[in-house]
A protein has these predicted regions:
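Positively charged, small/polar-rich N-terminal and surface patches that mediate targeting and assembly
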Residues: 1-108
Length: 108
């Protein structure tokens, strides 16, 4: 089992969620986050004054994924979140040792 963290542009969330549902990944945690990579933010004009926006709004999803689905899951996220522009995001894949369902204590 693996844990996928993906960070991408917020307007792509529905597209990513629907694409993952189609391949059988139906549960995920979604968090609104801010960050920057190579693009280092941008400059905006507000009431006549320029200021630098260092952190850009992003969405982060976290989903448990069976080992056999990891390649298709990362490809699915990549295709659904892709715009071709700077700041499209990143996908991180990590080993997942154990999951415990709080309600029942079930592990797996």
């Amino acid at each position: 089992m693996k844990l996928i963290f993906a960070v991408f542009k917020p307007f792509k969330l529905d597209e990513v969620r629907e694409a993952l549902t189609e391949i059988g990944i139906t549960g995920m945690t979604v968090t609104e986050v801010k960050g920057f990579g190579r693009q280092k933010g941008h400059t905006e004009l507000y009431r006549g004054a320029e200021y630098v926006v260092d952190f850009l709004p992003k969405v982060q999803i976290m989903a448990a994924c069976p080992d056999g689905l990891i390649d298709i899951a990362t490809e699915t996220i990549r295709n659904a979140a892709h715009t071709g522009k700077i700041g499209d995001g990143k996908i991180f894949v990590m080993p997942l040792e154990e999951v415990v369902r709080i309600r029942t204590g079930e592990t797996g």
